[in-house]
């Protein structure tokens, strides 16, 4: 239907926008038409910034967060607590925790969860890098801030099994409903979740 209404180039923009999370058919059409008709300069600015970012952004060699440098700002910050390592699923979780101001340690971003049905295993989550970081640093606590979904539980269990017994492993959970995503929690709930974390 859209091919009869829109030209091939407009349809291509709409289909590209539909690949973004939470963007459906109607939203992608609205965005495409706004950018092309009402604000072409915004479209060009977005395209240029994305081209520049994709050419220059990489993953931090330590925590796997997106950064322009080999080491991100948090990993290079000497004021952060090197003995605490918080394992999270995505940078959105990092943003939520940082904005809540509840944690001053370092992170490791999994960029996903173990999900055999989706072809995601330990190697896709760079758990070998995580294991090396834990071995190299004097870490006394690993905090698993992983969403309590089925895949999240599997991931948390796998990670807890690969960590040395002399390292404290804790899991946030208070106020985090099963199936809930960490990035959507309000700051007060996150604060309670961190303060009430339980040992594994």
UniProtKB/Swiss-Prot annotation:
The Toprim domain covers: 83-177
Gene3D superfamilies per UniProt = 3.40.1360.10, 6.10.250.240, RecR Domain 1
> PROSITE patterns recorded for this chain?
RECR, TOPRIM
> Its Gene Ontology biological processes?
DNA recombination; DNA repair
Xref: InterPro entries: DNA_Rcmb_RecR, Rcmb_RecR, Rcmb_RecR_Znf, TOPRIM_dom, TOPRIM_RecR
Where, if anywhere, are coiled coils annotated? none
Q: State the function annotated in the UniProt record.
A: May play a role in DNA repair. It seems to be involved in an RecBC-independent recombinational process of DNA repair. It may act with RecF and RecO.
Protein name, per record: Recombination protein RecR
């Amino acid at each position: 239907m859209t091919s009869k209404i829109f030209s091939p180039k407009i349809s291509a923009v709409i289909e590209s926008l539909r690949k973004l999370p939470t963007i459906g058919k109607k939203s992608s059409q609205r965005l495409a038409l706004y950018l092309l008709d009402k604000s072409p300069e915004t479209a060009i600015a977005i395209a240029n910034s994305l081209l520049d970012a994709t050419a220059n952004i990489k993953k931090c060699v330590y925590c796997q967060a997106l950064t322009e440098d080999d080491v991100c700002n948090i990993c290079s910050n000497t004021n952060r607590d090197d003995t605490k390592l918080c394992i999270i699923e995505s940078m959105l979780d990092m943003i939520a925790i940082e904005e809540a101001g509840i944690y001053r340690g370092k992170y490791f971003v999994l960029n996903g969860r173990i999900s055999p049905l989706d072809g995601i295993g330990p190697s896709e989550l760079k758990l070998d890098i995580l294991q090396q970081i834990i071995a190299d640093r004097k870490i006394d606590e690993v905090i698993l801030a992983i969403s309590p979904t089925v895949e999240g539980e599997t991931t948390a269990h796998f990670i807890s099994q690969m960590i040395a017994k002399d390292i404290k492993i804790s899991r946030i959970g208070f106020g985090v409903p099963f199936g809930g995503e960490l990035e959507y929690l309000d700051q007060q709930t996150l604060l309670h979740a961190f303060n009430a974390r339980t040992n594994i």
